[in-house]
Amino acid sequence: TCLARDELCGASFLSNFLCCDGLCLLICV
């Protein structure tokens, strides 16, 4: 499942990028 960064991680400076599965969580932490 792919979610926009702002959906999964809150509004970050990369919010216009997409991240899939746990990758976004790893980037955000």
Curated annotation (Swiss-Prot):
GO MF, one annotated term: toxin activity
Tissue-specificity statement: Expressed by the venom duct.
GO cellular component term, pick one: extracellular region
Signal peptide start and end residues: none
The organism's place on the tree of life at top rank: Eukaryota
Disulfide cross-links: 2-20, 9-24, 19-28
Localization annotation: Secreted
Keyword field: Disulfide bond, Knottin, Neurotoxin, Secreted, Toxin
Principal localisation: secreted
Domain notes: The presence of a 'disulfide through disulfide knot' structurally defines this protein as a knottin. The cysteine framework is VI/VII (C-C-CC-C-C).
Task performed by this protein: Intraperitoneal injection into fish (1 nmol) provokes hyperactivity and erratic swimming in various directions after 14 minutes.
Protein name in UniProt: Conotoxin pr6a
Organism from which the protein derives: Conus parius (Cone snail)
